[in-house]
């Protein structure tokens, strides 16, 4: 017991179609000494930087990479615009409010405090485009996300559960139910979408009718624990989804983290990119955020906030200032000629 080393290796996520090559099981070498195996363990920070080259093209890690959901929605957006042009729909059917000299319309959604209802609608729309415009050839399907193997309710799963794409309203109701019961914030919804796209990229899988509920559930579960100050426990989700067990939730969370390679970091630049891309998605699909006329109270509040930011900016610039002389009253020293005799 004192001179032997034991290692517990967790089982990798089971695959249904292709072998998962990103996660390699640990194989101890009997020829290595204890010094070679114990002192040269890889640090977790080194493991996170393995795919630095691929990270530049991963939208959930790099702020300059385009989000996947926005690119998947472009085809449908172009078709909608084309149909509107062909059918000669008048622009008056879409009621939009525009600011004028007398009235200014603003929405209450900002990057730091997004509107909860419309953020969930945008996230549900992004998930809808992920499912609708997925790879037609079909990629591998992990058992842990298969709703037939791990049902969320005791009701019988229909035999064609993996054939029909869910509607946007169905996805919205599912996400809204979880957010309302767990009292999650709008920021958590954006982080949920970041984790979802990171999972699809890292694990090289597609979200489809057979697995979308459990993938979304795992992303919400992880985002609520990472982002919110008052994290929701797994047993709380079991009270929301009455027929799911705590063991199933624990296994879902464990394998989700494993497939993310334990990379739960969301930089502020990536978060801001997803927020503004969601706004672009909403505008392209006529899902506008609620606009309200600018009131006097809100104008004073915005003025106070801007003045506070301006004062902070001035305080930061003060140590950097250098005194300089004006050229108007510039007096140069005059040298009197010296007589050398």
From Swiss-Prot:
Membrane topology term: Lipid-anchor
GO CC terms: cyclin-dependent protein kinase holoenzyme complex; cytoplasmic cyclin-dependent protein kinase holoenzyme complex; nucleolus; nucleoplasm; plasma membrane
PTM sites of type Phosphoserine: 21, 25, 33, 71, 73, 83, 99-100, 102, 280, 288, 295, 324, 326
Places the protein is found: Cell membrane
Keyword Iron: no
Single GO biological process annotation from the record: cell division
Sites of N-myristoyl glycine lipidation: 2
Broad class of where this protein is predominantly found: membrane
Domain of life: Eukaryota
UniProt keywords, alphabetically: Cell cycle, Cell division, Cell membrane, Cyclin, Lipoprotein, Membrane, Myristate, Phosphoprotein, Ubl conjugation, Wnt signaling pathway
Modifications the protein undergoes after translation, according to the UniProt entry: Ubiquitinated; leading to its degradation.
Record bears the keyword Lipoprotein: yes
Domain Cyclin N-terminal, first and last residues per copy: 143-265
Entry's family note: Belongs to the cyclin family. Cyclin Y subfamily.
Subunit structure as annotated in this protein's UniProt entry: Found in a complex with CAPRIN2, LRP6 and CDK14 during G2/M stage; CAPRIN2 functions as a scaffold for the complex by binding to CCNY via its N terminus and to CDK14 via its C terminus. Interacts with CDK14. Interacts with CDK16. Interacts with LRP6.
Name by which UniProt lists this protein: Cyclin-Y
Organism: Mus musculus
Gene name tied to this protein: Ccny
